């Protein structure tokens, strides 16, 4: 399905009366004696201003049926948050028992803190069982030591969060002004509440772009010793045994022989309260290989998620403001999954005032690449501009997605503006590339991607114009399709009927584009219509047609025809009608099914296109089993029909993916997971095979961690490998 995603621009919920918005201001309550219980009427909670009148952002209505109240106080060392959640008549869900596992499956309450006004945003949440979760805008590896307790009484529950100031990156001042918000999730209804509210806020947590709508909190006192996080060092020791003990995942996604790294180091040294030096020496990634396998045929290159600590920390500093994407991940000059195993990396990153930046160097077998990212973003996130640059130097046989000998330098400038009052917004992106590949010059290797938008509570309009040169292909970047030029448009409508209607919310979306190559032929054209309806009984229905035509060259073997003079061009379809049905999505026990069908081009063994009719289906579910176990199951199928030499007969091919996982909690800081995946048949996108993997994780009170992994879920078939890894951590917690 085609889609368009936009950075720095909000979604479009139904209008409702505002409660607390960004114009509100509050003063921090400083106490000498820390609170000891949940009673909001007791000292010192009673000194703080009560926080109430939450908004149900899912239904865009005041949260009066399940009210939430809270208070916040500070002392010299910590932020204390007490929250009372009334939930009479609705089941309180507390199925999880291990910290940072299963976020969103249980009820939770939490706080969001923007400590600098420039991207240093944090969320801290806890469930009725006292299970903790936390997120940082800077890194997915944010996992410091902090505390939370909870208590259930009848149909209500209470929580207290204790957050050390030392784990937060704050301003370099003794008295500071932050922005903050309180949030709540009711799992059995799949509904979210927020205290700070604007009609353009998004209905999910964590959402770091919504910080622009939060009120301010003045008078936050931060002692000088808490201004700067402590230096952090992580030293790991690792042993790998088994027949495949030296097989590890590469930039291509496949596995190859590579020497095991038995010892490695990651370090983070704060230079100021918001700027740090990050270093990695002989890093190991065996415990972050994840299952991203699919059997669905693809029209374009598929983007992968990055989980390696060195790249994931501070990743947002290298992303252009106003970045947007059509039909896949955005065109980027730096796409870290294209970098394979590396030997060392250094990085300087952080923020000051309205500026943020990152400077990175990574080197490994046959490559040495440097990346610069700079952003200027106003505190309300309404305006920003950014500059990115990548200098890549690759030798033959290097461990990246481009193993050839190539030198490449790429620049990208972008700017974005959005007016919350009028709803108008603009985004401009321009990049140029110069490299050792023939004709890789700014005249032919460039991209210009621009957008104008109008966002209102019940509708949105996006108009795009994209011009990507035929030689644009940054070797450390991600490019869906080059040699395109033309307009596109997306129009969406939404409604939240309320009242006695059986519909909770609904949306209708239309998208189309027509993009030419330099010969004047249509290189790509798309149209889709999509309807999305969520009912109050938790049934979710999504359906619509999608049509796409793509011109290929050299008899269908090349995506870009410039070098070959656009000879032997052929236009092929990638069409599908689809329908998906979900029940209890967003709750601990979801059921989901989808079906799609249509003429969708595939390729034979020689890489030539063949006319194919593709049918696909998917079924999945997950659920808690008792108080310790969580299970999930999925089955996907692909059936391809294509002509044979006999005009009246078709040949068939297919593929089936089955996936099952079981997790067991051993306490707040340890868990075991088992995974089984099988792919059979060759009529699909995946490679056949059976994969069995298992992992055990234990976190200790000294913040050290133990990992024991058998195999890996990232492989097509079972990797006969057992990895035992211990991480010894000094200083502050992971990701701080």
Language-model features: locations:
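Outer-membrane beta-barrel transmembrane domain signature of Gram-negative proteins
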Residues: 205-226, 365-404, 543-588, 593, ...
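Structural preference for beta-rich elements and adjacent junctions enriched in aromatics
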Residues: 18-371
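Surface-exposed extracellular loop regions of Gram-negative outer-membrane beta-barrel proteins
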Residues: 226-278, 367-433, 497-500, 505-509, ...
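Outer-envelope beta-barrel architecture signal
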Residues: 77-79, 120-122, 157, 174-178, ...
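Boundary at the C-terminal end of the N-terminal hydrophobic targeting segment
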Residues: 11, 15-18
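Bacterial N-terminal signal peptides
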Residues: 1-11
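Exposed, low-structure sequence patches enriched in small/polar residues
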Residues: 341, 425-736
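Catalytic-domain carbohydrate-binding cleft regions of carbohydrate-active enzymes
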Residues: 161, 179, 256-257, 285-473, ...
């Amino acid at each position: 399905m085609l889609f368009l995603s936009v950075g720095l621009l909000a979604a479009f919920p139904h209008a409702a009366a505002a409660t607390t918005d960004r114009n509100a201001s509050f003063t921090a309550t400083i106490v000498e004696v820390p609170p000891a219980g949940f009673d909001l009427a007791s000292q010192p909670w009673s000194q703080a201003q009560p926080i109430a009148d939450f908004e149900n952002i899912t239904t865009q209505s005041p949260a009066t049926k399940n009210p939430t109240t809270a208070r916040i106080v500070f002392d010299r060392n910590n932020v204390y948050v007490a929250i009372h959640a009334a939930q009479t008549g609705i089941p309180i869900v507390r199925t999880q028992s291990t910290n940072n596992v299963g976020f969103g499956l249980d009820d939770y309450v939490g706080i969001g803190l923007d400590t600098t006004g420039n991207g240093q945003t944090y969320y801290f949440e806890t469930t009725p069982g006292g299970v903790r979760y936390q997120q940082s805008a800077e890194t997915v590896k944010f996992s410091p030591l902090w505390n939370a307790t909870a208590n259930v009484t009848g149909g209500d529950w209470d929580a207290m969060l204790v957050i050390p100031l030392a784990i937060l990156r704050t301003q370099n001042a003794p008295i500071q002004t932050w922005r903050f918000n309180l949030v709540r999730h009711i799992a059995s209804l799949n509904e979210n509440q927020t205290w700070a509210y604007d009609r353009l806020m998004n209905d999910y947590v964590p959402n770091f772009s919504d910080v622009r709508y939060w009120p301010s909190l003045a008078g936050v006192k931060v002692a000088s010793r808490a201004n700067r996080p402590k230096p952090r060092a992580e030293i790991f020791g690792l042993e790998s045994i088994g027949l495949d003990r030296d097989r590890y995942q590469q930039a291509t996604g496949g596995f190859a022989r590579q020497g095991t790294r038995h010892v490695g180091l990651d370090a983070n040294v704060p230079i100021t309260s918001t700027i740090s030096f990050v270093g990695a020496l002989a890093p190991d990634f065996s415990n972050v290989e994840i299952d991203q396998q699919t059997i669905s045929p693809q029209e374009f290159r598929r983007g992968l998620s990055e989980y390696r600590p060195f790249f994931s920390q501070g990743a947002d500093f290298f992303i252009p403001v106003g970045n947007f994407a059509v039909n896949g991940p955005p065109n980027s000059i730096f796409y870290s999954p294209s970098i394979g195993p590396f030997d060392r990396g250094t990085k300087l990153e952080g923020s000051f005032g309205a500026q943020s930046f990152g400077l990175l160097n990574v080197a490994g077998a046959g490559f040495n690449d440097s990346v610069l990212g700079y952003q200027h973003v106003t505190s309300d996130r309404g305006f920003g501009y950014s500059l990115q640059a990548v200098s890549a130097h690759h030798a033959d046989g290097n461990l990246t997605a481009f193993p050839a000998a190539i030198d490449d330098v790429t620049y990208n400038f972008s700017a974005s503006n959005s007016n919350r009052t009028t709803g108008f917004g603009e985004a401009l992106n321009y990049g140029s590339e110069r490299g050792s590949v023939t004709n890789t010059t700014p005249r032919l290797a460039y991209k210009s991607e621009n957008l104008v938008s109008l966002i209102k509570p019940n509708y949105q309009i996006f108009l795009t114009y994209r011009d990507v040169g035929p030689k644009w292909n940054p070797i450390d970047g991600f490019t869906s399709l080059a040699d395109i030029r033309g307009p596109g448009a997306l129009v969406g409508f939404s409604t939240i009927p309320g009242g006695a209607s059986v519909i909770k919310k609904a949306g209708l979306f239309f998208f189309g584009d027509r993009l030419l190559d330099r010969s004047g032929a249509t290189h790509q054209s798309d149209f889709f219509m999509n309807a999305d309806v969520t009912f109050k009984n938790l049934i979710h229905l999504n359906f619509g047609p999608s049509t796409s035509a793509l011109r290929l060259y050299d008899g269908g073997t090349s995506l870009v025809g410039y070098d070959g003079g656009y000879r032997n061009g052929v236009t092929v379809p990638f069409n599908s009608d689809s329908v998906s049905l979900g029940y209890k999505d967003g709750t601990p026990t979801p059921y989901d099914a989808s079906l799609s069908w249509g003429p969708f081009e595939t390729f034979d063994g020689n890489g030539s296109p063949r006319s194919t009719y593709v049918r696909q289906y998917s079924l999945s579910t997950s659920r808690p089993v008792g108080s310790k176990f969580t299970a999930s199951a999925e089955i996907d199928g692909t059936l391809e029909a294509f002509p044979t030499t006999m005009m009246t007969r078709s040949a068939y091919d297919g593929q089936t993916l089955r996936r099952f996982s079981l997790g067991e909690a051993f306490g707040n800081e340890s868990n075991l997971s088992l995974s089984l995946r099988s792919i059979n048949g060759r009529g699909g996108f995946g490679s056949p095979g059976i994969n069995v993997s298992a992992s055990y994780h234990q976190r200790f009170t000294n913040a050290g961690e133990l990992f024991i992994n058998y195999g890996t879920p990232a492989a097509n078939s079972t990797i006969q490998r057992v990895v035992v890894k211990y991480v010894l951590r000094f200083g502050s917690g992971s990701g701080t």
